[in-house]
C-alpha cells in the first residue's frame, strides 16, 4: 500500500547580467540572480542503494553574484585563453548532504540547513598550437560556511557549527589535460589523437569540523587521478576507435561516503557514423 502526497509551492526568480570589453580581447561580465533550486529526485526519494530520500525538503533560495574576466587571443598559430571568476552566494534552506545510520547501514541523507554563505573563485588557463596540440586546466576553491548563528528552535544558544565549513563536500579541486592530434596520418582525412587528463581533490571532512577530536575525525583524503586515451579516426571521422586507461597509476580514489572507487580500468570503443 502507498499514500498519495502532494505539495505545491511557487516562487519568482529573476536575474540580470551585463558584459563589457575593457580592451579588444579582455571581457568583463557581472551578473546577479535570485535563484531557486528544487530538490532532485534522489534527494527526495533516494536511489534504493546508498541514498535515503526525504520527501519534506524545501527548495533552496539564494542571492547569487558572479564576476568574470576572460582574455583570449591568437598569436599566429598560437592561441591563449585565460579566465577568472569570483562568486558570492547567500543561500537559505540550503540542501545539505550528510550521513546517517539506518538499520545498521550508512546512507546519504539530505536536509534543509537554515543559511549558508558561499565565497569562491576559479581560474582557467588554456594554450593551443594550431590544430596539433592544446593544454590547459582549471583550479577551483569553493568556501561554503554555516551562517545559521543559533540552533534551530533555540534563539539563545549559538550553534557550534556557526562559521564552520559545510561538511561532506569538496572545496578545493582542479582538473588539467593535454591533447595531441596528428592529422592526415597514413591517409588524408585520418587522425591520430593522444589525450591525457588528471584530477586533483584536496581532502575534506565528512562531518562538522567543530565536533569531536581533530586527530580522530573522518576525512576523505587527498586524491590525484590520471587518465590516458588513444584514438584513431578514418575518413574524417566516419570510422573511429579508441583505447582508454582510467586511473592508470592505480591510485586510491574515494566518493563522498569515503567508499573506495574502482582502481585502474581499461576501455575500448569503436564507432561508425
List each model region and its residues.
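Signature of Gram-negative outer-membrane beta-barrel scaffolds
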Residues: 1-23, 38, 143
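Membrane-embedded beta-barrel scaffold of Gram-negative outer-membrane proteins
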Residues: 21, 27-31, 59-119, 140, ...
Amino acid at each position: 500500500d502507498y499514500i498519495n502526497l502532494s505539495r505545491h509551492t511557487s516562487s519568482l526568480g529573476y536575474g540580470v547580467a551585463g558584459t563589457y570589453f575593457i580592451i579588444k580581447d579582455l571581457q568583463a561580465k557581472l551578473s546577479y540572480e535570485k535563484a531557486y533550486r528544487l530538490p532532485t529526485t534522489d534527494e527526495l526519494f533516494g536511489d534504493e542503494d546508498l541514498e535515503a530520500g526525504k520527501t519534506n525538503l524545501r527548495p533552496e533560495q539564494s542571492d547569487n553574484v558572479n564576476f568574470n574576466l576572460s582574455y583570449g587571443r591568437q598569436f599566429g598559430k598560437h592561441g591563449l585563453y585565460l579566465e577568472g571568476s569570483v562568486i558570492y552566494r547567500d543561500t537559505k534552506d540550503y540542501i545539505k548532504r550528510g550521513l546517517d545510520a539506518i538499520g545498521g547501514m550508512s546512507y546519504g541523507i539530505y536536509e534543509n540547513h537554515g543559511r549558508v554563505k558561499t565565497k569562491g573563485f576559479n581560474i582557467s588557463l588554456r594554450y593551443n598550437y594550431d590544430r596539433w596540440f592544446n593544454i590547459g586546466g582549471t583550479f577551483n576553491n569553493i568556501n561554503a560556511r554555516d551562517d545559521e548563528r543559533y540552533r534551530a528552535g533555540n534563539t539563545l544558544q549559538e550553534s557550534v557549527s556557526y562559521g564552520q565549513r559545510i561538511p561532506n563536500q569538496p572545496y578545493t579541486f582542479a582538473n588539467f589535460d593535454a591533447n595531441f592530434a596528428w592529422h592526415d596520418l597514413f591517409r588524408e582525412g585520418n587522425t591520430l589523437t593522444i589525450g591525457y587528463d588528471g584530477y586533483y581533490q584536496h581532502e575534506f571532512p565528512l562531518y562538522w569540523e567543530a565536533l569531536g577530536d581533530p586527530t580522530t575525525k573522518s576525512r576523505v583524503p587527498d586524491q590525484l587521478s590520471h587518465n590516458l586515451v588513444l584514438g584513431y579516426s578514418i575518413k574524417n571521422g566516419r570510422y573511429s576507435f579508441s583505447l582508454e586507461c582510467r586511473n592508470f597509476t592505480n591510485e586510491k580514489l574515494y566518493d563522498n561516503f569515503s567508499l573506495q572507487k574502482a582502481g585502474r580500468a581499461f576501455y575500448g570503443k569503436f564507432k561508425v557514423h
